[in-house]
């Protein structure tokens, strides 16, 4: 599937089958020279007994998408791709965290 085919199918609200979802998650597109496809960030949930949830945020031609996979953690567990891509907004945010602590110091006693 090309990048433009993916975007067109997404915009037309077509459902992707599991094979398509795997290719999309792996960013396995046929790209033209002007296509821009990047992974922005990835996050893994805590491993469960047999699998872990993997979320990937990507930029595809200036649009941002969340992609998901349930990755098998053993050679007997397949990775499953069941969740459809979801377009998201993206912005970098700088946050400042204020920490309040208690301080104690000794008082000198008068003699």
Question: What are these language model-derived features?
Answer:
Residues 4, 16-20, 68, 74-77, ...:
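Generic marker of "main functional regions" within proteins
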Residues 77-111:
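Mixed-charge, Lys/Arg-enriched low-complexity segments
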Residues 33-85:
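Acidic, low-complexity, intrinsically disordered interaction modules
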Residues 2-38:
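Negatively charged, low-complexity tracts enriched in Asp/Glu with abundant Ser/Thr
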